[in-house]
């Protein structure tokens, strides 16, 4: 009996490591673009958000059947919590609002963590690639449009 319990425990630990690693990689990829552009929330913030969201979801899924934890409620609270963090990076200066893209990116990093925690790795890869591409492509388009408008 001891052997089976050890195997089951090792599977749980391996599953946890896999999910946290996936969340970490997604957060790093998303944060790398923000860091490269010198934004206020870069590698560390996006990676920690993805990991934190993953841990909260993993915990809720772990105890869902034992204590009647509703994992969807935990997911919604992750969104609320990230909303506060995102609000902290949004600034208004004169008639311009700055930080909306960074706030939205932090929100997407939390979603990446949630996807990793639920084992939706293909969806996680698609989300991560889309977030990076959107930030890169539309960041370039935005700056190009701003230059033309200023002329």
Regions found by a protein language model. Give the residues of each.
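Hydrophobic transmembrane alpha-helices of secondary-active transporters
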Residues: 25-30, 84-91, 113
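Small-residue-rich segments of transmembrane alpha-helices in multi-pass membrane proteins
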Residues: 48-58, 80-83, 104-117
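Alpha-helical transmembrane segments and their membrane-interface boundaries
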Residues: 1-74, 121-124, 140-147, 151
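Hydrophobic alpha-helical membrane segments of integral membrane proteins
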Residues: 99-104, 122-127
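Alpha-helical transmembrane segments and their membrane-interface exit regions
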Residues: 82-85, 130-140
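Membrane-helix boundary connector in multi-pass membrane proteins
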Residues: 94-96, 110-123
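Membrane-helix interface "capping/anchor" motifs
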Residues: 36-41, 91-102
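Alpha-helical transmembrane-segment detector that highlights a single hydrophobic TM helix
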Residues: 67-90
